[in-house]
Amino acid sequence: MNYIQWNYEDDLLAGTTLRDPSLPENNNMALHACLRKEDVLNNRDTLSKALHIASSQWTFAMQTHSDHIHEVTAADAGRGYRVYEEGIADCDALYTKERNIAIGVFHADCVPVLLYDPFTGIIAAIHSGWQGTVQEITRKTVTLLMQKEHVDPAHLMAYIGPAIAYRSFEIQQDVIDRIRAMSFDTRDYLTMLPNGRAIADNKGLNMQMLLNLGVER
């Protein structure tokens, strides 16, 4: 199984699974975007065994390109692993203070952002397509952690995973307008094209939100 591993400390296990032609549906992990649910569940089970994480320890959401954030508690453990509709409803960012719970988001072109605070042990997983980005879900997640959980953004570690390449993400005027209306200067992340469209750096926009809040690692 192909994956990128991001480990900052021995007690943190984080990363991104990748396409793998040797596995069913190229290692697809998403129940909401698959041909056969059985293949996705087999892929999830293969990953769980490789990581020594039980299926009852995972928690997933029903992603809707929202700016909704959910704190995962022990009562949420196992939700969304085998049945998509049992996942956290209408949510695109998860975080938890619980140990031995795995959280994750599903992405292809969209930007995945993982956060870890080594001082509090809090972890977060954010799914940010362009809709989530213009709603500033990454900024809102960090702000919630600061205000509710008293996280110091200077302590946060951030990982921005694979997503659509900057030069491949062409957008029309409606999306251009929404990016320009964000709460910070986004000009460096838009390149106008002769056809009136633009290419947008979705990863860069999420990175800038982190930097604006004092997350620098």
Regions found by a protein language model. Give the residues of each.
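Active-site microenvironment for binding and transforming phosphate-containing groups
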Residues: M1-R217
